UniProtKB/Swiss-Prot annotation:
It comes from Agrobacterium fabrum (strain C58 / ATCC 33970) (Agrobacterium tumefaciens (strain C58)). SUPFAM superfamilies: P-loop containing nucleoside triphosphate hydrolases (SSF52540). NCBIfam families: DTMP_kinase (TIGR00041). It comes from the Bacteria. It catalyses: dTMP + ATP = dTDP + ADP. This is Thymidylate kinase. InterPro entries: P-loop_NTPase (IPR027417), Thymidylate_kin-like_dom (IPR039430), Thymidylate_kin_CS (IPR018095), Thymidylate_kinase (IPR018094). CDD domains: TMPK (cd01672).
Length: 224
């Protein structure tokens, strides 16, 4: 029997970049082609991690400081990996995750001013070898992304505390994501998020398509 191995794709980017919309679109397309797909998110994705998500995004953890917040993120990520992501990959499924390790590097590292070595040590413990085969970084000017996020809030969505931060902070995060893509070109692809939604979808699929043959083989193995 062939070894079962799924496909892990993470979606990264600043506020209002359109990640969640593209995850839903991609998941629907892949399921239509017969793939088993798990859609998940961070912080959260598992019962334990969702409890931590509420603490972090509500702002309740801010009083503990950015270092403790990074530890909370890592704890949530480890639970998510062990309870959801690793089992799904072992079943030969495709995992689409809205944010993963790069968000910690950017949000707690770059704009949280935590030492890179501290962040990387936490990540090694949290992910325990589970790294996305592909990371799609959705790039859009911070001002445009925040305008989208505000429109979403006007339509009833609850803004999280990150959306309320200064524009300069969001621009630093954009630059940090682009730096990650430059440093890890084999894993990361930049998606121009400042274009019509259907064109963004085309670009996403152009990056995902080369990986689907392997995922298809994994799905076949999972049913042997």
């Amino acid at each position: 029997m062939a070894e079962k191995t799924g496909l892990f794709i993470s979606f990264e980017g600043g506020e209002g970049a359109g990640k969640s919309t593209q995850i839903r679109t991609l998941a629907e397309a892949l399921r239509g082609r017969g793939f088993e797909v798990v859609v998940t998110r961070e912080p959260g994705g598992s019962p334990g991690a969702e409890a931590v998500r509420h603490v972090i995004l509500s702002g309740a953890a801010e009083s503990f400081g950015v270092r403790m917040e990074a530890i909370l993120f890592a704890a949530a990520r480890n639970d998510h990996v062990e309870e959801v992501i690793r089992p799904a990959l072992a079943r030969g499924e495709i995992v689409l995750c809205d944010r993963f390790l790069d968000s910690s590097r950017v949000y707690q590292g770059t704009t949280g001013n935590l030492e890179p070595d501290f962040i990387e040590t936490l990540q090694r413990i949290a992910i325990d070898g589970v790294v996305p085969e592909l990371t799609l970084i959705f790039d859009i000017a911070a001002e445009k992304g925040l305008a989208r996020a505000r429109k979403r809030a006007d339509e009833g969505a609850t803004p999280d505390r990150f959306e309320k931060e200064e524009i300069e902070t969001h621009e630093k995060r954009r630059e940090a994501y682009l730096d990650i893509a430059l440093a890890e070109p084999r894993r990361c692809r930049i998606v121009n998020a400042d274009q019509p939604e259907d064109k963004v979808t085309e670009d996403v699929m152009s990056f995902v398509e080369p990986l689907l043959e392997r995922a298809g083989n994994a799905a076949d193995a999972a049913h042997e």
